[in-house]
Amino acid sequence: MDFPLANLFFVPSEDATAFGRRLRAAAQQAPIVFDTAFGMPILLRKSHITTAYRDTATFSTRMFQAGILNGGLAAMQGDEHARMRRVYNMFFLPRAVSQYEERFVRPISEQVVDRLAGKPRVDLLEDFAMELPRRVIGELFGFPAEKLHETDERVRAMLRGLVRMHDPAAVAESQRAYGETLGLITEVVERESRDTSDTLLGEILRTLKAEHMDTIEASRQIVLSLILGGYETTSWLVANTIHALLAHPDTLARVRQDPSLLPAAIEEGMRWCPSSFGVLRMVERDVRLDDQALSAGTVVCLAGIAGNYDETAYPSPEVYDIDRKPLPAANVFGGGAHFCVGAPLARMEARVGLQALLARFPGLRAVPEERPSFMYGAKDSVAHGPDKLPVLLH
């Protein structure tokens, strides 16, 4: 393999569109590049990525079997994955998501917004975009409130080890954080198994029992998988959508006046300023994609978000336009058999939280002299987003 070298990810910019435009520019030069900072080949061409999503025998997630996700949904293949995926899907059916909205997300959103009231100025990244998913995860799984912030840091450490698997220090830190988090997960699972509640964790235990899979290990793996996906995905989705709206006051005014536009604002936000870098796959056999050769055993990144700035799909892609028809494809959730199972919850959480925020603070606006900087790896995460979101509330 001899691909052009690139540095696509760890590049800060005050322009929220720089990441997407940089990936698109790279895709126009070569279908596959080797990112020197990321340490792996990056697939940029849509046809190659579609092939990789569909051909799970050639492009697998088997590399996760060697780490903290071993035994979890992300590491499973074939029939085993299909069976467990069916179990996971039960937790995110429309009826279930609607119940989470009314019982957890809506009241928590109001509580988080209440805590902002009376402050003339806040950082919506820390005080809202991070706080909302943190609180929701805590309630859904019954985590003690005093454990939420340290769990947040451990989740980031675990994710860094999963994504930067070529970095021994990141992997070691991930394993340490995993051991600490596993103790907390075991504690809440054992407590819930003695007295099953109406939380998501209670629903998980009841479902596993009905499927004759009710073991502590199965429960722990599901909780771990959902925590790893639930924190970062939603936090950065919310943060990037907030920035998109603040940067476009006319659109912000429209959405505030008509909250039914929020789903479009969120979907376009995921295109305009994507939080995800892509997804990882392991090449199981020597394969050629057109004239590009990939060797068995290579871990690659499928950067589907390179298509977010494809002018043929999205005219004037640098423009944040919530009236695009059809709505942009949400590449941040991956694709194929391993498409993010919690996407309905993340979308709902963003919609409900943003609606509460905009309704409470009609004077919400950015602090003009403090522009956030955007980068993949913001705040030591594995996401693309801002380092801050300073706003005036009134």
From Swiss-Prot:
Pfam families: p450. Gene3D superfamilies: Cytochrome P450. It is an enzyme of class 1 (oxidoreductase). GO terms for molecular function: heme binding; iron ion binding; monooxygenase activity; oxidoreductase activity, acting on paired donors, with incorporation or reduction of molecular oxygen. Belongs to the cytochrome P450 family. The production of regio- and stereoselectively hydroxylated steroids is of high chemical/pharmaceutical interest. Mutagenesis can change the selectivity of cytochrome P450-mediated steroid hydroxylation, providing the basis for further experiments to engineer the biocatalyst toward novel steroid hydroxylation positions. This is C-19 steroid 1alpha-hydroxylase. It comes from the Bacteria. It comes from Sorangium cellulosum (strain So ce56) (Polyangium cellulosum (strain So ce56)).
